[in-house]
């Protein structure tokens, strides 16, 4: 979305000048609807459309940010950068909001190697990725689903 020129995404205004793979100035929560294809939705729309109360949205956003901070800390201890991730929340019959689905797996998250700890926060146009984006990137470049065995092994 950003690469196509949008600067307001998920109700958040992003500054001009971000480069691909550049760390954002702040951690952001980017909610989506759940379906065959996830669609962006703003926090305001979530409340206005009755998906959640403002209080429940604030609770979920707070928990998502805390989980992400925890994930980044744990990843860094292992020489990794937790780039982004997906959290899914649900509600029990008694109304309690809970985290559902997987947490910080390679299927729900993107990880990069910290190649040089001294350059951890510097821009890296070609980070070493440890996730399924390797396969996605190959398919985009070659337009082929004939994925070499060595690439599959790498993933």
Regions found by a protein language model. Name each.
Residues 1-84, 90-155:
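Acidic/polar, glycine-anchored loop/turn motif associated with catalytic or activation segments
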